[in-house]
Regions:
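Ferredoxin-like alpha/beta domains used as RNA- or RNAP-binding modules
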Residues: 2-17, 24-25, 34-93
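Short N-terminal binding/cap micro-motifs at the start of the first secondary-structure element
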Residues: 29-31
Length: 93
Protein backbone atom coordinates (compact mmCIF):
# COMPACT_ATOMS: atom_id res chain seq x y z
CA UNK A 1 0.00 0.00 0.00
CA UNK A 2 2.83 2.41 0.72
CA UNK A 3 4.17 1.86 -2.78
CA UNK A 4 0.87 3.02 -4.29
CA UNK A 5 0.75 6.14 -2.12
CA UNK A 6 4.28 7.10 -3.12
CA UNK A 7 3.41 6.48 -6.77
CA UNK A 8 0.30 8.66 -6.52
CA UNK A 9 2.22 11.53 -4.91
CA UNK A 10 4.91 11.34 -7.57
CA UNK A 11 2.38 11.81 -10.39
CA UNK A 12 1.59 15.28 -11.63
CA UNK A 13 -1.97 16.43 -10.95
CA UNK A 14 -2.81 16.43 -14.67
CA UNK A 15 -1.52 12.87 -14.98
CA UNK A 16 -4.20 11.68 -12.56
CA UNK A 17 -7.11 13.13 -14.54
CA UNK A 18 -8.96 10.34 -16.32
CA UNK A 19 -7.39 7.55 -14.25
CA UNK A 20 -9.56 4.89 -12.67
CA UNK A 21 -9.15 4.60 -8.90
CA UNK A 22 -10.38 2.15 -6.28
CA UNK A 23 -11.50 3.47 -2.90
CA UNK A 24 -9.87 1.55 -0.06
CA UNK A 25 -11.23 3.48 2.95
CA UNK A 26 -14.59 4.84 4.08
CA UNK A 27 -18.20 3.95 3.30
CA UNK A 28 -17.39 3.66 -0.38
CA UNK A 29 -14.62 1.07 0.11
CA UNK A 30 -14.35 -1.10 -3.00
CA UNK A 31 -16.05 1.39 -5.35
CA UNK A 32 -14.48 2.48 -8.62
CA UNK A 33 -14.22 6.15 -9.60
CA UNK A 34 -12.61 8.26 -12.31
CA UNK A 35 -10.44 11.23 -11.29
CA UNK A 36 -11.92 14.40 -12.77
CA UNK A 37 -9.80 16.99 -10.98
CA UNK A 38 -7.70 17.89 -7.97
CA UNK A 39 -8.26 20.20 -5.01
CA UNK A 40 -4.79 20.25 -3.48
CA UNK A 41 -1.72 18.07 -3.16
CA UNK A 42 -3.63 15.61 -0.96
CA UNK A 43 -7.17 15.63 -2.38
CA UNK A 44 -8.69 14.66 -5.72
CA UNK A 45 -12.20 15.01 -7.15
CA UNK A 46 -13.87 11.76 -8.20
CA UNK A 47 -16.91 10.77 -10.24
CA UNK A 48 -18.57 7.45 -11.04
CA UNK A 49 -21.13 8.81 -13.50
CA UNK A 50 -24.23 7.77 -11.55
CA UNK A 51 -24.32 8.58 -7.83
CA UNK A 52 -21.32 10.93 -7.90
CA UNK A 53 -21.73 13.00 -11.05
CA UNK A 54 -19.44 15.65 -12.50
CA UNK A 55 -21.77 18.33 -11.09
CA UNK A 56 -21.80 16.74 -7.58
CA UNK A 57 -18.44 14.93 -7.32
CA UNK A 58 -16.78 13.25 -4.37
CA UNK A 59 -13.56 14.53 -2.86
CA UNK A 60 -11.17 11.94 -1.50
CA UNK A 61 -7.76 11.92 0.15
CA UNK A 62 -4.99 10.40 -1.98
CA UNK A 63 -4.10 8.12 0.93
CA UNK A 64 -7.54 6.52 0.68
CA UNK A 65 -7.43 5.44 -2.97
CA UNK A 66 -5.48 3.01 -5.12
CA UNK A 67 -4.72 4.16 -8.66
CA UNK A 68 -5.34 1.53 -11.32
CA UNK A 69 -3.57 1.53 -14.67
CA UNK A 70 -6.79 2.06 -16.64
CA UNK A 71 -7.26 5.38 -18.40
CA UNK A 72 -9.55 6.10 -21.34
CA UNK A 73 -8.37 8.89 -23.65
CA UNK A 74 -11.94 9.69 -24.70
CA UNK A 75 -13.02 10.19 -21.09
CA UNK A 76 -9.92 12.26 -20.32
CA UNK A 77 -10.58 14.51 -23.32
CA UNK A 78 -14.23 14.83 -22.28
CA UNK A 79 -13.23 15.84 -18.72
CA UNK A 80 -10.72 18.42 -19.92
CA UNK A 81 -13.15 19.94 -22.45
CA UNK A 82 -16.01 19.89 -19.88
CA UNK A 83 -18.29 17.96 -22.24
CA UNK A 84 -21.93 17.57 -21.15
CA UNK A 85 -21.90 13.81 -21.82
CA UNK A 86 -19.02 13.08 -19.46
CA UNK A 87 -21.20 11.36 -16.83
CA UNK A 88 -22.60 8.96 -19.41
CA UNK A 89 -19.13 8.12 -20.70
CA UNK A 90 -17.83 7.50 -17.17
CA UNK A 91 -20.85 5.37 -16.30
CA UNK A 92 -20.40 3.17 -19.39
CA UNK A 93 -16.68 2.75 -18.78
Amino acid sequence: MTKVIIEVKSLQNNDLIGKVVLSNRGRDKGHLYVVIGHLSDNYVILSNGSTKTVQMPKQKNLKHINVLDDVDDEIKASIISKDRGTDLKIKRF
